[in-house]
């Protein structure tokens, strides 16, 4: 008879462990998982009261899941280490068996009466929950009377095995939760860094054309409107797109970029909309598209003028309905995405030729911003050159590299078909290949007929913009900050004549922002910094 009971107990243990193992590996919802585990234990052990307590950051054991408790009993399930039977199990890290709770002085009766309503004895079995030698909590079972079908030793053994499985799951869950929290914090820090990197204050452009671009960006960024950025390749459309995102209410959401020209029609559809498992050869699992990934943020479609007419129709539907289906799927997915597009093509001509759908053109051309080519804002070139030289110095840990006036004249007279991107490459290439710390005109590839721009575009007759020395700044600059009388006349006074006073005046007018004061004085930020040091002018902090 004992052998039969032992066999039944072993079979019960195997079945119970198997079912609980499946539950623990089926979900990342810890609360739901633990509840299902306790339900299995309650059914297999034929008991109505099962409790699971875990150690909290407060240093207390707290009930996190239970079967057979009232709300009041559940809320009272808190124990200090060593307090009551539960606290004692945690403290000693050993199981405790109580055959009659009415006779046990350690029992506090917070989660169970000492006797059943009909006076029947209530017994108790509790085991510690451990993982990698770390105490995590306590698993307890209450029973009215004694079980006729199994011994207490069998129950202790079963509960210990279950507690070990629970401990491993809890430890893994907490590890994943900690990593997720760390990733979220890193994401927030990266987002703050990107916001600083791509804010408009860091976009170089003192020219009137770029100031107009900045004004349009500030005006349109807070809205939900679809935007179209237009300009030649290399003018900085992506930088402006990111600035729009980080100036908008969606700045804490994702910024997702897709280069439409780099993907075929089939790949572009899968990339934007995602795909279901088995949608095509090689689709081993479902995959979210860029529209889903950009939910709550901004989707930047670069080179939108290069997409095929067939795909234009699919994109139009998404823009109209704000929903789509994954490739190979039938379920509609709704998204909240702000769309920013960019192109270097003449879309109006493309529409006239039938190469671009007119209805899609009207959808994306809600707010249009034109980014001027570098040759139309040559006054920005000295500041861009200085910025790229400083970037090169920091990235390569080099000494300060300067550019001679003759070298700057070459830069100012270049056609720059590749715009800012080409300018940056030219500065980096020249600074890398030169010897010494001063770039002269002989260091440039174009002076050796090794530059494609020199071959394709002969220098024009445009006069370079002269950087006015500080001492030559005269009264008209005072009008930049002067009060206006509404008739187009400045009423403010001209800046002071002394160089030190002029520096202080410019800094005061610009709120002690060095970059703004430098632009007002038509000098570079580096020159501004040198001048402030030279005259021992302390920069005020606000």
UniProtKB/Swiss-Prot annotation:
Domain Sigma-54 factor interaction per the UniProt entry, residue ranges: 203-432
DNA-binding region as annotated in the record: 514-533
Presence of keyword Acetylation: no
Binding site for ATP: 231-238, 294-303
UniProt xrefs under NCBIfam families: nifA (TIGR01817)
Superkingdom of origin: Bacteria
SUPFAM superfamilies to which the protein is assigned, alphabetical: GAF domain-like (SSF55781), Homeodomain-like (SSF46689), P-loop containing nucleoside triphosphate hydrolases (SSF52540)
Ligase found in the keyword field: no
Coiled-coil residue spans: none
Keywords, sorted A to Z: Activator, ATP-binding, DNA-binding, Metal-binding, Nitrogen fixation, Nucleotide-binding, Transcription, Transcription regulation, Two-component regulatory system
Domain spans labelled GAF: 29-170
Inter-domain linker as annotated region, ranges: 433-499
Source species of the chain: Herbaspirillum seropedicae
Record-listed a divalent metal cation binding positions: 446, 451
MF terms (GO), sorted A to Z: ATP binding; ATP hydrolysis activity; DNA-binding transcription factor activity; metal ion binding; sequence-specific DNA binding
GO biological process, one term: positive regulation of DNA-templated transcription
Self-association and partners: Interacts with sigma-54.
Protein name (Swiss-Prot/TrEMBL): Nif-specific regulatory protein
UniProt function note: Required for activation of most nif operons, which are directly involved in nitrogen fixation.
Region (C-terminal DNA-binding domain): 500-542
One family name in Pfam for this protein: Sigma54_activat
């Amino acid at each position: 008879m004992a052998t039969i009971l032992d066999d039944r107990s072993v079979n019960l243990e195997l079945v119970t462990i198997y079912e609980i193992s499946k539950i623990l590996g089926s979900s990342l919802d810890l609360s739901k998982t633990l509840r299902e585990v306790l339900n299995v234990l309650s059914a297999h052990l034929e008991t109505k009261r099962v409790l699971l307590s875990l150690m909290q950051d407060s240093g207390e054991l707290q009930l996190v899941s239970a079967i057979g408790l009232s709300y009041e009993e559940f809320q009272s399930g808190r124990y200090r280490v060593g307090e009551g039977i539960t606290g004692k199990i945690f403290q000693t890290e050993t199981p405790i068996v109580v055959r009659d709770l009415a006779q046990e002085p350690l029992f506090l009766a917070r989660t169970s009466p000492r006797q059943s309503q009909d006076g029947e004895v209530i017994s108790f079995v509790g085991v510690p929950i451990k993982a990698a030698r770390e105490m995590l909590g306590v698993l307890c079972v209450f029973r009215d009377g004694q079980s006729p079908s199994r011994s207490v030793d069998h129950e202790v053994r079963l509960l210990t095995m279950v507690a070990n499985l629970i401990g491993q799951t809890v430890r893994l869950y907490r590890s994943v939760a900690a990593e997720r929290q760390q990733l979220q914090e890193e994401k927030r820090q990266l987002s703050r860094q990107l916001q600083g990197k791509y804010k408009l204050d860091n976009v170089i452009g003192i020219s009137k054309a770029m100031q107009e671009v900045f004004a349009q960006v500030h005006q349109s960024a807070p809205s939900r409107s679809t935007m179209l950025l237009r300009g030649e390749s290399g003018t900085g459309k992506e930088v402006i797109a990111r600035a729009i995102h980080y100036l908008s209410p969606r700045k804490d959401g994702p910024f997702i970029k897709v280069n439409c020209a780099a993907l075929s029609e089939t790949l572009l559809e899968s990339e934007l909309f995602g795909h279901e498992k088995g949608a095509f050869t090689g689709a081993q699992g479902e995959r979210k598209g860029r529209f889903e990934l950009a939910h709550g943020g901004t989707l930047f479609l670069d080179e939108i003028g290069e997409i095929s007419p067939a795909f234009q129709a699919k994109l139009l539907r998404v823009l109209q309905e704000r929903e789509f289906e994954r490739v190979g799927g039938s379920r509609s997915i709704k998204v909240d995405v702000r769309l920013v597009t960019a192109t270097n093509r003449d879309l109006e001509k493309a529409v006239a030729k039938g190469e671009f759908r007119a209805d899609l053109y009207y959808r994306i051309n809600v707010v249009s911003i034109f980014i001027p080519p570098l040759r139309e804002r040559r006054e920005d070139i000295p500041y861009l050159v200085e910025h790229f030289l400083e970037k090169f110095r920091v990235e390569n840990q080099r000494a300060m590299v300067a550019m001679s006036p003759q070298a700057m004249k070459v830069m100012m007279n270049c056609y720059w078909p590749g715009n800012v991107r080409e300018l940056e490459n030219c500065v980096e290439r020249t600074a890398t290949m030169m010897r010494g710390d001063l770039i002269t005109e002989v260091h440039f590839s174009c002076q050796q007929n090794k530059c494609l721009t020199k071959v394709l575009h002969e220098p024009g007759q445009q006069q370079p913009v002269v950087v006015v020395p500080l001492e030559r700044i005269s009264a008209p600059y005072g009008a930049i900050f002067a009060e206006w009388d509404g008739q187009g006349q400045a009423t403010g006074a001209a800046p002071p004549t002394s160089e030190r006073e002029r520096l202080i005046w410019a800094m005061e007018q610009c709120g002690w922002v060095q970059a703004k004061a430098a632009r007002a004085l038509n000098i570079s930020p580096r020159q501004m910094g040198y001048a402030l040091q030279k005259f021992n002018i302390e920069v005020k902090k606000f």
